């Protein structure tokens, strides 16, 4: 089920109440905004080109706040700094080594949560008759589905 994996777990966690947010940013895209360009590309003469599919780059604080608002929940208000995340990473590895719990943090994951890398998904819009869905509408739809 969607709410048990991937982005769905994030929605479920925010619905339960999320107090912390990573300090980095993330590129987001709706599922339909991945599928529709793929179909358009298969029907086009475009060959051997790569496309980045990102509708918007958002700070985690803003993204999690928008999702929380659409779920009628309080937005997270405490930053998860790089130092705090690395402390959690070390604790995670210790608990894993002791056999107490399964590991969930990696150095790469910590770095990605703190990264402010921006992605440009505009190439697909220039090459095809395509435009990304409004992020706000997509998040509201997902939140409505979750509440149902």
Named regions from a protein language model:
Residues 27, 78, 117:
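Residues that recognize and position ribonucleotide moieties
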Residues 19-20, 103-106:
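A short, mixed-charge helix-start or loop-turn motif at secondary-structure junctions
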Residues 1-27:
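NAD(P)-dependent short-chain dehydrogenase/reductase
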Residues 37-104, 121, 135-146:
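Mid/C-terminal beta-alpha module of Rossmann-like enzyme folds, strongest
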Residues 127-131:
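Aromatic-glycine-rich donor-binding/catalytic loop that engages nucleotide-sugar donors
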Residues 29-32, 58, 133:
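Residue-level signal for the nucleotide or nucleotide-sugar donor/cofactor binding architecture
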Residues 60, 108-120:
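Active-site loop of classical SDR/Rossmann-like NAD(P)-dependent oxidoreductases
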């Amino acid at each position: 089920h969607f709410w048990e994996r991937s982005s769905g777990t994030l929605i479920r966690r925010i619905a339960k109440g999320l107090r912390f947010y990573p300090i980095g940013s993330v590129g987001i895209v709706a599922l339909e905004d991945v599928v529709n360009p793929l179909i358009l590309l298969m029907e086009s003469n475009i060959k051997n080109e790569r496309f980045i599919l990102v509708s918007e780059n958002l700070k985690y604080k803003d993204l999690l706040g928008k999702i929380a608002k659409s779920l009628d929940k309080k937005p997270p208000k405490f930053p998860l700094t790089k130092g705090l995340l690395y402390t959690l990473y070390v604790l995670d590895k210790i608990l894993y080594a002791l056999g107490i719990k399964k590991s969930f943090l990696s150095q790469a994951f910590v770095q990605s949560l703190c990264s402010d890398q921006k992605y440009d998904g505009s190439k697909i819009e220039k090459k095809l008759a395509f435009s990304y869905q409004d992020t706000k509408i997509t998040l509201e739809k997902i939140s409505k589905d979750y509440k149902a």
